[in-house]
Amino acid sequence: MKHFGWWFTGVMLIAGLIVSVMALTPMGEKPFRAMFEPGEVTFIDFAEVSMERRPNRFLVCPTFDLCAELNDRTAIFDAEIPQLKARWDELIALEPRMELVLADEEKMQYVYIQRSRLLRLPDVFTVQFYDK
């Protein structure tokens, strides 16, 4: 039985070393991205979205009439949409591992995926710009 304990410990140390190397080096980018795919990414109809389907969803809107349900309210900016969108793009460009995956210019809705630094776990962000 003691022999099994040493063997198991050795296997776990090797597995931990492999995962650590993959997580801390660019070598792990592709395998972790493949393991942690976000699934089907689609546009959201904020007026119809339900919080019941996804417990890890957090919905923020400027007013209740734009969203079916919401967790918090956003600020309302006194700016034209093109200027606001340009500033948004500047801020998004500063975020590490952020990728635009869907864009609907007509609805002004954009879907981004940002991955965590170590395991490349995906977070999906959807933003839509509304005119006053």
Where are the regions a protein language model picked out?
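Ser/Thr-rich, low-complexity intrinsically disordered terminal regions
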Residues: 4-9, 19-132
